[in-house]
Amino acid sequence: AMLRGTGVHAGAEHNFEQKIESHEDLPSDDIVGAAVAGFEEAVAGGYSLTDDEAEKNVKDVIGEQKDVVVDMAKLHAAEQAPDYQPVAVEQYVRLELPDHPRDLVGVIDLMDDQDRVIDFKTAGRKKSQTDADTSTQLTVYAAAHKRLTGRDATEVRLDTVVKTKTKTTRDVVSSTRGAADFDALANRVNVITHAIESGTFTPATPGTWWCSQKFCGYWGTCP
């Protein structure tokens, strides 16, 4: 699932980078081709299988996932891409934290000409409003947008291609960020930094969705 997201992301990046100047989307086939190439490159770099996938032929599993990448990339080209005129794509940013031993770095998927900050996702279910309202990632992106442009983001957005067993759809959930959110982010960074410096690494709570073989790359080595 993670690798197919990498593939779709590669297709989006390929299109949006040229759209900054051209103001036109590439043909769908070009976007899909870039997505498949990104997926294949990710697979070549290594992958892990769930227990269910391990019981199947590996080539069949990879072929099935490639088909999903094609479906998702087609939807991206048809529904997501036309909605945005990008001004920055995969924008690296470093936020210097005063009186802090470390800086905060991130890469913003897309900033557009309406001062919107967009995080593209692929998932098996729709995102909730709570997902957007509480996303630390979106808060970091909004802070980075303000640092880069001097302006508040008009909107932060989770724009997700949702793939279920029966269909592929688009889901958009929007939120906003302000000064109070940035203060809360700074406090969170301070807590995390203190934990790192003191060597306190709290394990995930068993039973949470990310503490599973499907979503955690460290599942096989976790004590």
Provide a role label for each language-model segment.
Residues 1-223:
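RecB-family 4Fe-4S metal-dependent nuclease core
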